[in-house]
């Protein structure tokens, strides 16, 4: 019985450890308002490759123009402060090399060293680990800061505009006649441009869909961990109640067997989902770093503390699943063994009683002679 209580404590400890580890998924958000951030991956822009130098110089001028446009049409700004707001530190700078993004499943945090007024902030992101969503929402956030409007609304609006443009472009390319006419005007020497654009948009749509699905797998993983903990507590309570009341095991066989089977399946599902999520983070980091084409690399990404936390939790979930399969055994086998032990004990008690009767019948010290014993047996 002592071993059974120790197994209860170990299973509960592992289940609580798995459950509490899921709290790291809800950091790096503005709604949670937590002092820590445990990102799945961290990225920043590079300025030491030929591609990044050309791209960022062009993008910087474009965003500076948009920033000036936003400031000029903001009627709430005092004209005496307009010159100070033209300072480069107040302009949109999402592609600055000193910016560092900490991306998590439900939000991201940004650290920008060149901005003294707002060098760190966190934003909710409902699109999971989608790096495109992070950049577009951050662009909307900075437009909201410049125009002194609600930054969350502007971030969401920019993302909606992006999705609308992608959907419209998809519908446009589905019409081969109109799509070919436009692309021939832009690139008359490339007859395969139509198919290339379709492939690019298809990859973008797949990328968005995969990130949304993986975000919901994180939610499902949290729910499964909670169910595992509740079923484990219920299973332990049923075992203790059975020990106290000494009720027949057959009455509890079906319930206990069902709990054992469900908990086993949930533990395996938890470990499998976590493993798939880790593979996605590793693949995403590999794709962002663009290891194959170093000259085209404009972003450098690395695993964050949340990713390492996921890897550690995967091994904990794996051990928990093994312990569930080892200790949460169905009660049919246990009841059969208990019944066999009870029957063998009853047979041994009966044989011992017969031996004592024969011994007392043949023992002179008991006051009974052998003749009396013979007459008693007859």
Curated annotation (Swiss-Prot):
Keyword Transmembrane helix carried by entry: yes
Gene Ontology CC terms, in alphabetical order: prospore membrane
Disordered, as annotated region: 344-365
Transmembrane segments: 6-26, 218-238, 268-288, 303-323
UniProt subcellular location: Prospore membrane
Lumenal side: 27-217, 289-302
Domain of life assignment: Eukaryota
Main location: membrane
Residues exposed to the Cytoplasmic side: 1-5, 239-267, 324-378
Keywords: Membrane, Sporulation, Transmembrane, Transmembrane helix
Record carries keyword Transmembrane: yes
GO biological process terms, semicolon-separated: sporulation resulting in formation of a cellular spore
Skewed-composition ranges (Acidic residues): 347-357
Topology within the bilayer: Multi-pass membrane protein
Family to which this protein belongs: Belongs to the SMA2 family.
Its biological purpose: Involved in spore and ascus formation. Required for the efficient assembly of the precursors of the prospore membrane to a continuous prospore membrane.
Protein name in the entry: Spore membrane assembly protein 2
Organism from which the protein derives: Kluyveromyces lactis (strain ATCC 8585 / CBS 2359 / DSM 70799 / NBRC 1267 / NRRL Y-1140 / WM37) (Yeast)
This protein's encoding gene: SMA2
């Amino acid at each position: 019985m002592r071993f059974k209580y120790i197994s209860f404590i170990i299973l509960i400890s592992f289940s609580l450890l798995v459950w509490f580890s899921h709290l790291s998924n809800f950091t790096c958000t503005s709604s949670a308002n937590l002092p820590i951030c445990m990102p799945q991956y961290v990225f920043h822009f590079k300025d030491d490759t030929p591609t990044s130098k050309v791209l960022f110089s062009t993008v910087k001028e474009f965003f500076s123009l948009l920033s000036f446009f936003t400031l000029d049409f903001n009627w709430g700004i005092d004209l005496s402060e307009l010159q100070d707001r033209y300072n480069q530190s107040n302009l949109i700078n999402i592609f600055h090399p000193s910016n560092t993004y900490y991306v998590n499943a439900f939000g991201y945090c940004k650290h920008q060293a060149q901005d003294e007024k707002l060098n760190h902030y966190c934003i909710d992101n409902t699109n999971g680990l989608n790096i495109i969503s992070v950049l577009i929402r951050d662009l909307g956030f900075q437009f909201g800061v410049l125009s002194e409007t609600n930054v969350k609304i502007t971030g969401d609006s920019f993302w909606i505009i992006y999705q609308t443009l992608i959907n419209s472009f998809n519908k446009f390319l589905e019409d081969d006649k109109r799509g070919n006419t436009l692309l021939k005007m832009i690139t008359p020497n490339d007859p395969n441009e139509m198919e290339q654009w379709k492939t690019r948009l298809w990859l973008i749509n797949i990328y968005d869909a995969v990130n949304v699905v993986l975000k919901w797998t994180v939610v499902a993983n949290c729910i499964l961990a909670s169910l595992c903990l509740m079923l484990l507590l219920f299973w332990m309570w049923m075992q203790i109640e059975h020990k106290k009341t000494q009720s027949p095991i057959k009455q509890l066989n079906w319930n206990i067997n069902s709990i054992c089977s469900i908990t086993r399946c949930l533990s395996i599902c938890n470990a499998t989902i976590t493993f798939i999520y880790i593979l996605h983070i590793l693949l995403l980091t590999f794709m962002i770093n663009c290891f194959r084409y170093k000259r085209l690399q404009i972003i450098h990404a690395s695993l964050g503390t949340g990713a390492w936390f996921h890897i550690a939790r995967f091994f904990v979930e794996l051990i928990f699943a093994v312990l569930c399969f080892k200790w949460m055994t169905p009660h049919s086998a246990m009841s059969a063994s208990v019944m066999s032990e009870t029957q063998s004990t009853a047979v041994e008690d009966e044989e011992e009683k017969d031996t004592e009767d024969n011994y007392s019948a043949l023992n002179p010290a008991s006051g009974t002679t052998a003749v009396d014993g013979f007459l008693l047996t007859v």
